[in-house]
């Protein structure tokens, strides 16, 4: 690269360009994984059925 990536203008439509909105998107009401953690998704069967579960 001949120029740093930080020199590129942001177009505003990417999540990284909107940190305030990005922080609002991780509320328990909107995120599927929060409810699973509260209910205890750490059984082997849930980990098999839900690959990528954060508590597995």
Swiss-Prot record:
It is found in: Secreted. It comes from the Eukaryota. Disulfide bonds join 41-55, 42-53, 47-56. GO terms for cellular component: extracellular region. Residues 9-40 form a propeptide. Pfam families: Conotoxin. One of its GO terms (molecular function) is ion channel inhibitor activity. Keywords: Disulfide bond, Secreted, Signal, Toxin. Expressed by the venom duct. InterPro entries: Conotoxin. Residues 1-22 are annotated as: Disordered. Residues 1-8 form the signal peptide. Belongs to the conotoxin M superfamily. The cysteine framework is III (CC-C-C-CC). This is Conotoxin reg3.9. It comes from Conus regius.
């Amino acid at each position: 690269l001949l120029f740093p990536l930080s020199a590129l203008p942001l177009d505003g439509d990417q999540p990284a360009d909107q940190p305030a909105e990005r922080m609002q998107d991780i509320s328990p009401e909107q995120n599927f994984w929060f409810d699973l953690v509260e209910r205890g998704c750490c059984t082997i069967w849930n980990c098999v059925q839900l690959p990528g579960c954060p508590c597995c």
